[in-house]
């Protein structure tokens, strides 16, 4: 069975993306995989190791929280899904995973947490559009 | 998912897009509008003898031909399908139709007939992505 990747970062558009992905999955007969990408922590090498560890823990907590919220929506619709956490640059990681044979396409919110309010399309969605070789649904 | 808009220019990617749109529409019994937008011909101002109306009429006919070819390629369907040909700037016209008709999803080919092979995302898809406030599915 084919799967549809849903990019989740806990933001409102990404949760809307989950709902849209449920519809799309019903149409193309696919199962959902919710994906959270933890961006690399970029700090100067002199940073106290404990600080980096704490940041990484905080990131992992955020990932679990966002995935659980998204999974609740899928469960509410009477569906099941898999949860995936990746580490790396968000758009690139999603595009790489989308290369897998099982993947039909990717659903992503137009803007995540970091976008400026006046832009319609955030940088991750924009970049994913340009590098992904499978269908991409942008949800607003 | 009640109304789906598909934009087509007769390219392979847009035909694939139309297939996906029909597939998604089926379980929801959604209405599908297949739209072909022909760009206005721009001639230098010192060509006043050019029969613009006739040129545009023949361009609109070309759009209709693209639509009938697309529908023929998709074969018979039980879906509620309508078609529309419009003359205007392509991305802007698709966006305008999507928003005024409150479509639940807009489906586009990632690149049409004009795009260079090596680019993954054509200019029309890119522009619609940035302009449109409805969910957009780009199919490669």
Which residue stretches match the model-derived regions?
Chain B
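Glycine-rich, Arg-bearing micro-motifs that act as flexible, cationic patches
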Residues: 105-130
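Short, hinge-like loop/turn segments at secondary-structure boundaries
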Residues: 49-53, 100-102, 124-125
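Short glycine/serine/threonine/alanine-rich loop segments
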Residues: 30-31, 79, 103, 134
């Amino acid at each position: 069975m084919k799967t549809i990747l849903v990019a989740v970062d806990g933001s409102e558009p990404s949760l809307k993306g989950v709902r849209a992905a449920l519809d799309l999955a019903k149409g193309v007969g696919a199962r959902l995989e919710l994906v959270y990408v933890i961006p690399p922590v970029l700090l100067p090498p002199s940073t106290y190791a404990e600080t980096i560890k704490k940041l990484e823990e905080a990131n992992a907590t955020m990932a679990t929280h966002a995935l659980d919220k998204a999974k609740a929506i899928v469960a509410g619709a009477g569906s099941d899904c898999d949860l995936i956490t990746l580490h790396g640059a968000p758009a690139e990681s999603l595009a790489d995973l989308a290369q897998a044979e099982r993947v039909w396409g990717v659903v992503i919110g137009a803007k995540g947490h970091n976008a400026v309010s006046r832009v319609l399309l955030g940088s991750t969605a924009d970049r994913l559009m340009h590098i992904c070789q499978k269908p991409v649904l942008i949800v607003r | 998912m009640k109304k789906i808009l598909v934009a087509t220019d007769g390219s392979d990617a847009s035909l694939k897009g139309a297939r996906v749109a029909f597939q998604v529409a089926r379980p929801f019994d959604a209405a599908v509008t297949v739209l072909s937008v022909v760009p206005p011909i721009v001639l230098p101002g010192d060509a006043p003898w050019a029969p613009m109306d006739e040129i545009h009429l023949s361009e609109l006919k070309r759009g209709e031909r693209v639509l009938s070819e697309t529908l023929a390629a998709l074969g018979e369907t039980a879906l509620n399908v309508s078609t529309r040909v419009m003359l205007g700037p392509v991305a802007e016209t698709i966006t305008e139709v999507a928003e005024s008709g409150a479509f639940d999803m807009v489906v586009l080919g990632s690149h049409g007939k004009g795009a260079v092979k090596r680019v993954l995302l054509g200019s029309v898809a890119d522009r619609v992505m940035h302009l449109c406030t409805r969910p957009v599915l780009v199919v490669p």
